[in-house]
């Protein structure tokens, strides 16, 4: 339905995504071009295979996790276990969901001795000094709306301050509003 309204095509979302998917060769070409121009390459994995490709094959130095995967504990755990810094998009998440995601990341970065991955272990990792230190060193929260394009009235820039105060982490904005007006707000 989205494609029909906004793109004007009858193809399914799966067909569209398969058509737009970059090959491994295209990734290598893009990352080489970025390195030649001293541009930091960044990519978002949406599954464990893509995460492995980015970390093991392309050897990226940072990951971005999309809002839709904020509750994908296996992906979050594997991403943090890579040791790479992570930009975590928060989309429509409640603070409790962000805290749960941060618990998974804290566990992946600094697993408490002998703990198996589970909700209780994630909470302990989030509350631990080692987990907090890892989060502060490695994680940036990204405030964003999930509407494309987003009306200025929906930008809710105060959410960034709330996240910064709640989690004491670096916070940024993924701006989906048209133009640059939101960037000029104080």
Language-model features, listed with the residues they occupy:
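Catalytic cores and adjacent flexible loops of soluble metabolic enzymes
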Residues: 1-186
């Amino acid at each position: 339905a989205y494609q029909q309204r906004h793109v004007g095509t009858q193809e399914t979302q799966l067909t569209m995504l398969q058509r737009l998917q970059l090959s491994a060769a295209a990734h290598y070409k893009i990352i080489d071009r970025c390195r030649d121009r001293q541009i930091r390459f960044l990519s978002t994995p949406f599954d464990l295979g893509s995460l492995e490709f980015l970390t093991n094959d392309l050897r990226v130095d940072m990951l971005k996790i999309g809002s839709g995967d904020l509750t994908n504990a296996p992906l979050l755990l594997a991403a943090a276990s890579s040791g790479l810094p992570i930009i975590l998009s928060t989309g429509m998440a409640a603070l409790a969901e962000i805290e749960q995601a941060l618990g998974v990341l804290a566990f992946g970065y600094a697993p408490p001795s002998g703990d198996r991955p589970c909700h209780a272990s994630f909470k302990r990792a989030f509350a631990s000094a080692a987990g907090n230190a890892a989060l502060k060193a490695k994680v940036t929260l990204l405030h964003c709306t999930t509407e494309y394009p987003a009306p200025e009235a929906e930008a809710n820039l105060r959410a960034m301050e709330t996240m910064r105060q709640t989690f004491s982490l670096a916070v940024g904005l993924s701006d989906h509003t048209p133009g640059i007006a939101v960037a000029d707000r104080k």
